[in-house]
Amino acid sequence: METRAPRWVERDELNRDPAMQDFVQSLIARFGRELSVAVARSSLAPHLFVSRGAHGVFFVNRRPNTVFAFAYAGPDERFAGAAGDLFEYAARGKLVANILEEEPKAKELAGLGYTSTPFGVMQRVPRLAGFSLEGTKMRRLRYQIGHYEKHERCETREYRAGSDPATDRTVAALVDAWKAGKKQIGPYVDHFRGRIASGELPGDCRLFLTYRNGELDNAIVISRLPAANGYLMDLEFYGAEMPLGGLEFAISRILELLAKEGVSCFSLGATFGTQMEACAEEDPRVGKMLRGLHTARIFNNDGNFQFKNKFRPENTRLFVSRSRDAPSASFTDVLMIFADPENRRQSRQEAPASAPATTTPAAPVLPPS
């Protein structure tokens, strides 16, 4: 694809351009990592920024004064140049650009003079063939799996969405039950629930269902990571009555199956709002804000981090990089993209209403995992 100058592509334009879609998919197939393929990406970052020369793309979202790059797909050696294109594009529009990336690329940007503030962690089982429940480090995981297995007839099996309407309805009902226990959910959950209910799961996704005595306890969606010969644990749904160890049982069975298939790695996904200790490269104002929100349990996902750590993954920190002169107040826009990625709150405020719209910021909605 020939694109000499950097280019912003809106979601609607992307949906009407098959050539651009093919170009993006080719980049994901060759270079894409977890945030590029995650189900939440289509909601959190529905637009596209194409770098100069079309060497790479960022999946992006924006607010009136802010650009947020959720994921990059392209060659590693082109990342710094693509990031520079995005920072330059944003500056011309008097916008503040923010780029979410793992530590190696964030350190690269810090070396170029940008700040890189801790925002979370990526957790991976890098060598699936060597994964085992044996050893003292796996004692807690073994205990929880064993606790679940004490219930009779526990099994995890892959299900092809659409192959049985009754099962599709049961899975959709499980998603509804899971939603009922959450204060807030991202819009991508409802979008995905609709696809499950209609039996239209995306081709790169696989669905695994775990039953206990014939009752559905949880559903796990994994998404293919073609560039790594791996899979991402993308979405997990479970009911209130699921006993201790239900998710651990399901994940261990999925890992066992994937290893037999020759899959190389398994990612437990990104966990935002954890492991945000101060570092030399951070924007101290943003770091202080995030740690305050973490202490107040507004932006805190420590429990999810600890859950995934039972599988003894490799953990790589995630950072948000931005210009050193960027106003710290603008970082609230990044948090609001997580809380309201489709900007529905602003739409409600602009629409005529019988009662005044609230302006109280919502707590960030962390992708389910």
Which residues does each predicted region cover?
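A conserved beta-strand-loop-helix scaffold within acyl/acetyltransferase catalytic domains
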Residues: P6-F70, N98-F119, L128-P284, T295-Q306, ...
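Segments forming glycine/polar-rich beta-alpha architectures that bind adenosine-containing cofactors
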Residues: A69-Y72, R78-A83
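Conserved beta-strand -> loop -> alpha-helix junction used to position metal-binding or nucleic-acid-contacting
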Residues: Q123-R124
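Contiguous alpha-helical scaffold segments within structured protein domains
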Residues: G287-R291
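Long, low-complexity, intrinsically disordered segments
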Residues: A362-S369
